[in-house]
Amino acid sequence: MHLYKTSTPSTRNGAVDSQVKSNPRNNLIYGQHRCGKGRNARGIITAGHRGGGHKRLYRKIDFRRNEKNIYGRIVTIEYDPNRNAYICLIHYGDGEKRYILHPRGAIIGDTIVSGTEVPIKMGNALPLTDMPLGTAIHNIEITLGKGGQLARAAGAVAKLIAKEGKSATLKLPSGEVRLISKNCSATVGQVGNVGANQKSLGRAGSKCWLGKRPVVRGVVMNPVDHPHGGGEGRAPIGRKKPTTPWGYPALGRRSRKRNKYSDSLILRRRSK
């Protein structure tokens, strides 16, 4: 991490990653057309504060880890503009080259492997049934063979707390406790770049490069734009409770859909 000198207001307290480079392999990237910018098919804003941003090349990440029982070596640790975690380029013994999420503490030259009954070592991928209780894991499958879908953000880590019957009980980074099939795979260890959420960008322009627009309070808008808007001067919102721009209750109302198939698999809801 490189901290800028406090020479100008725009760079004061800013920080950038100086050690991690971005020089991806051509056969592991492809262009993507980012359309919508938070709009739906009618052109109406459905997700706020999105738009602009620098062009990106998508890196193909191996979330399935289906190179079974073939050892690979970490060749580079690279920056990925599509996620806040770093990625590693792996050279496998059979000549295959793939990107994976960078496990915390992994360095260039380390070896990894995936499969059944492989060592419980940082970066190795194996089924939950072969892991001891208390193992810290990330990149967890929900559906067998579909690839990791849980605990993939920077610093994310889940914990295997029980195994019974055909299911394993996991405590996820959100605090949720849920059941997953013991045959699903996961990667040992924690995702790297733990301090990603504590990094100071230093200026508004750096936020714009990430494709994030300014956040504006509803109370300073016009009535046509937000239910909180309008009034003379600094006026209250004029309602009993805060609402979203579309008039639905905000700040506390549960937004999860009812009667989902996974309701029976969640033993304890996530903590807020």
Swiss-Prot record:
Family from the record: Belongs to the universal ribosomal protein uL2 family.
Question: What GO biological process terms does the UniProt entry carry, in alphabetical order?
Answer: mitochondrial translation
> Could you tell me which Pfam families the record lists for this protein?
Ribosomal_L2, Ribosomal_L2_C
Q: Which SUPFAM superfamilies match?
A: Nucleic acid-binding proteins (SSF50249), Translation proteins SH3-like domain (SSF50104)
Compartments (UniProt record): Plastid, Chloroplast
Q: Which GO terms describe its molecular function?
A: rRNA binding; structural constituent of ribosome; transferase activity
The organism's place on the tree of life at top rank: Eukaryota
Q: Which Gene3D superfamilies match?
A: 2.30.30.30, Nucleic acid-binding proteins (2.40.50.140), Ribosomal protein L2, domain 3 (4.10.950.10)
Q: Where is the composition biased (Polar residues)?
A: 1-13
User: By its UniProt entry, which NCBIfam families does this protein fall under?
Assistant: rplB_bact (TIGR01171)
Q: How does it assemble?
A: Part of the 50S ribosomal subunit.
PANTHER family recorded: LARGE RIBOSOMAL SUBUNIT PROTEIN UL2M, RIBOSOMAL PROTEIN L2
Q: Which UniProt keywords apply?
A: Chloroplast, Plastid, Ribonucleoprotein, Ribosomal protein
Q: What is the lineage of its organism?
A: Eukaryota, Viridiplantae, Streptophyta, Embryophyta, Tracheophyta
Q: Which organism is it from?
A: Buxus microphylla (Littleleaf boxwood)
Single GO cellular component term: chloroplast
Q: What is this protein called?
A: Large ribosomal subunit protein uL2cz/uL2cy
Q: Which InterPro entries match?
A: NA-bd_OB-fold, Rib_uL2_dom2, Ribosomal_uL2, Ribosomal_uL2_bac/org-type, Ribosomal_uL2_C, Ribosomal_uL2_CS, Ribosomal_uL2_dom3, Ribosomal_uL2_RNA-bd_dom
**Region named Disordered:** 1-27, 222-272
